[in-house]
Design a protein with these regions (language model features):
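N-proximal low-complexity "stem/linker" segments adjacent to membrane-targeting elements
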Residues: 1-28
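Glycine-rich, basic loop-to-helix element that forms the pyrophosphate-binding segment
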Residues: 67-83, 96
Length: 346
């Protein structure tokens, strides 16, 4: 019988002692047994490292590496350098997957000779679960359709703007199965979050999708993404500068690869939508200071230029009102709508 292809499951771990056993149990109990589980303890200050060691001693498929804290991108890059499987899967240390995930993903990849397999996920809050729909049914993607997936990593276009809250639903690296050879051949890696703030997954996928010829989507909710509501907001001083680096990297990629006008428009839309994140970040301040921060964001040249070209026709009323305030440079309106969003989020 032909040997089944190995899946290398990469698990970055940082201070998740409370959830780590659930994650690891979901991996060691996969119905598809030909897996290696590569865990990188990114300088955890809790008992995460000890838990990893316990699992590593009891299951030969688990490799554990303890490193000084350098962030999730560094941890994933390190783990990737040790991977030997045909396929790569990422699972964060506080999340978990269904026990049939590897089996279903590998079957789909082999069935369609897919360079990428994707599936939706469930956001797991302390008191409820919320499925995140990506596509409504099973799909395969070829050539031009894979290019559209890549463009989605830059930003939304057209009717996609009807749901700005889903801008990055497709962009995670968990909920996907990758070909290790494709990653290695093209030297694809994760960017340091100290430089770009967030969205290391999206940049990874942007570069990976440039080389994907066939992709497949399974409509089963196989991944579980833990969301802890009620967390205290903390102001991220460097976020605006980091996102400028992110946008600059995207723009450089678009120009270098001659991606086209649709990628440019998608980036402008991403820059506009990022006002939401920057505004929510500002709400960590008292009201007067938060309002001053929001005025500063709205007056920035890059945001003024992007918001000027943002199409409004597809937005539902609440988003239309928010971006109308942005276009009008009406900081007080933006502030009040952000406060409403913050309350709704929890």
């Amino acid at each position: 019988m032909e040997q089944t292809p190995m899946v290398s499951i990469i698990v970055p771990v940082y201070n998740v002692e409370r959830y780590l056993r659930q994650c690891l149990d979901s991996l060691v109990n996969q119905t598809y047994q030909n897996v290696e589980i590569i865990c990188v303890d990114d300088g955890s200050a809790d008992s995460s490292g000890e838990i990893l060691n316990q699992y590593g001693e009891s299951d030969a498929r688990i490799s554990v590496f303890h490193v000084e804290n350098a962030g999730v991108s560094s941890a994933r890059n390190k783990a990737l350098s040790y991977a030997s499987g045909k396929y790569i899967m990422y699972v964060d240390g506080d999340d978990w997957i269904d026990v049939c995930t590897c089996e279903k993903a590998v079957f789909k990849a082999e069935e369609h000779a897919a360079d990428l397999v994707m599936w939706p996920y469930i956001r797991e809050f302390p008191d409820h679960s919320a499925p995140k729909v990506i596509f409504s049914e099973e799909k395969t993607f070829h050539a031009a359709e894979c290019r559209e997936l890549q463009r989605r990593m830059i930003g939304l276009l057209g009717t996609e703007l009807a749901h700005p809250e889903n801008a990055d639903a497709l962009c995670t690296v968990w909920g996907k199965l990758y070909l290790r050879e494709l990653i290695a051949q093209n030297d694809i890696h994760f960017t340091d979050l100290q430089r770009i703030g967030t969205y290391e997954d999206g940049l990874f996928n942007l570069h990976y999708l440039a080389h994907v010829k066939n992709a497949a989507y399974i409509p089963d909710y196989l991944s579980h993404y833990r969301k802890n509501s009620g967390m205290t907001s903390k102001y991220r001083k460097e976020l605006a500068a980091q996102w400028k680096n992110l946008f600059s990297d995207m723009r450089s990629y678009i120009e270098l690869e001659k991606c086209g006008d649709d990628f440019d428009a998608a980036l402008n839309n991403r820059i506009s939508l990022s006002i939401i994140g920057l505004g929510l970040n500002a709400l960590a301040f008292p009201s007067r200071e938060a309002l001053r921060e929001i005025r500063g964001i709205l007056s920035e040249k890059e945001y003024r230029a992007a918001i000027k070209t943002l199409p409004m026709r597809y937005f539902p009323l609440h988003w239309w009102a928010f971006f109308a305030c942005c276009k009008l440079n009406f900081a007080s309106g933006v502030f009040l709508l952000l406060k409403c969003m913050e309350r709704i989020k929890g």
